[in-house]
Amino acid sequence: MGSGWVPWVVALLVNLTRLDSSMTQGTDSPEDFVIQAKADCYFTNGTEKVQFVVRFIFNLEEYVRFDSDVGMFVALTKLGQPDAEQWNSRLDLLERSRQAVDGVCRHNYRLGAPFTVGRKVQPEVTVYPERTPLLHQHNLLHCSVTGFYPGDIKIRWFLNGQEERARVMSTGPIRNGDWTFQTVVMLEMTPELGHVYTCLVDHSSLLSPVSVEWRAQSEYSWKKMLSGIAAFLLGLIFLLVGIVIQLRAQKGYVRTQMSGNEVSRAVLLPQSC
């Protein structure tokens, strides 16, 4: 925040201590009350247009406001009229309030922009069918885009190089709660052998759009691919089991030299009593 802004607001709040008596003379005043000052900066197109607004609130009711577009304090209720008139008579307060557009808003924008509006995170793109794909059978193809920032993103579907628009559905950007977004764009399809579906993602964090393809295959090709994956995983499991057995077996042997010949001699591990 600008160096002069905090003392200025504090001074106004201290000045508001007279509010309890001036606003409630001749009325039943509450024993407890709350006075608040809330400052907001509104930016349009970066810092091209900046608006600084301070709201003064008494017991949840806004009664005086300073708006940099107006350039003065405005009473929003009858009870706020005395304070607005007094503060508008203070030329130093008016000038400091008007300067807050640069001293507070633009200053804080420059400090926060690198990790807020300037922050960019590239998306991860995955394409998969909703159900096991079969030729000539209606299905839904998902393009899942996750972990991107900012939330503005363009996702398109193509079939054999031609953009598909009529059968496209989207969840829209969903906030993850960690300053990233996710979305799923779905395409209704009836795959034919040789069809190539492409999800094209364009985002400000990318130097060029990212495309992920999904190709329609015959049932035989699909089952063959699944069988290949299963065989690979099974072979990997057997390999790991073999390595573990070999490592355990080697723990019970040492290698020594006898008469120039290398032999292996079993070594019994000590047993506890």
UniProtKB/Swiss-Prot annotation:
Residues 246-273 are cytoplasmic. Residues 215-224 are annotated as: Connecting peptide. GO terms for biological process: adaptive immune response; antigen processing and presentation of exogenous peptide antigen via MHC class II; peptide antigen assembly with MHC class II protein complex; positive regulation of immune response; positive regulation of T cell activation. Residues 27-224 are extracellular. Residues 1-26 form the signal peptide. The chain crosses the membrane at residues 225-245. Residues 27-120 are annotated as: Beta-1. Residues 121-214 are annotated as: Beta-2. Belongs to the MHC class II family. Heterodimer of an alpha chain (DOA) and a beta chain (DOB). Forms a heterotetrameric complex with an HLA-DM molecule during intracellular transport in endosomal/lysosomal compartments in B-cells. Important modulator in the HLA class II restricted antigen presentation pathway by interaction with the HLA-DM molecule in B-cells. Modifies peptide exchange activity of HLA-DM. This is Patr class II histocompatibility antigen, DO beta chain. The lineage of its organism: Eukaryota, Metazoa, Chordata, Craniata, Vertebrata.
